């Protein structure tokens, strides 16, 4: 049996951590000040019903998400849980093969692979598959 130290590390990396907020402008200012980040990008993702502030860190980023409509999943999250950590995203080079591999391990997904912002392919892993944590798999255009 191989030991943990002999296993090859995953090629996945943490892409971003997403936080649901009521006011993305106020939250972005607070995060900028607290973390010493000079620039913030703002983007609206119509398909998800959110306005996002993107704060770049050394090897990943934080995405602050505010709902833009009542049927947004983020609006539902804020109503039931309040502000806070929404999901963690893992980047992979081949989202299709990772989804196939994970399904073979019994991992459940919330929907199919779809287009996210800026040509990124995304899908979400059901929280019951990861001990209560909602996770996103993403694959960026090269």
Language model segments and positions:
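Vicinal oxygen chelate
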Residues: 2-8, 53-56, 90, 96-142
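Short secondary-structure junctions
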Residues: 36-44, 106-113
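Alpha-helix termination/capping residues and helix-transition junctions
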Residues: 11, 34-36, 82, 131
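Conserved active-site tyrosine of GNAT-family acetyltransferases
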Residues: 27-32, 102
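N-terminal beta-strand motif that seeds the catalytic metal site of vicinal oxygen chelate
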Residues: 2-28, 83-92, 141-142
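Hydrophobic, well-ordered secondary-structure scaffolds
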Residues: 8-10, 32, 42-44
């Amino acid at each position: 049996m191989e030991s943990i130290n002999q296993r090859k590390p995953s090629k996945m990396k943490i892409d971003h951590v997403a936080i649901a907020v009521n006011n993305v402008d106020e939250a972005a200012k607070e995060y900028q000040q607290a973390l010493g980040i000079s620039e913030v990008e703002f983007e609206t993702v119509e398909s998800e019903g959110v306005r996002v502030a993107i704060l770049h860190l050394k090897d990943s980023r934080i995405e602050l998400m505010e709902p833009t409509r009542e049927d947004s999943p983020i609006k539902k999250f804020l109503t039931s849980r309040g502000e806070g950590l929404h999901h963690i995203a893992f980047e992979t080079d081949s989202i299709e093969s990772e989804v196939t591999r994970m399904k073979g391990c019994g991992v459940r997904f919330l929907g199919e692979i779809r287009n996210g912002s800026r040509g990124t392919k995304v899908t979400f892993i059901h929280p019951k598959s990861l001990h209560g944590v909602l996770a996103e798999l993403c694959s960026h255009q090269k």
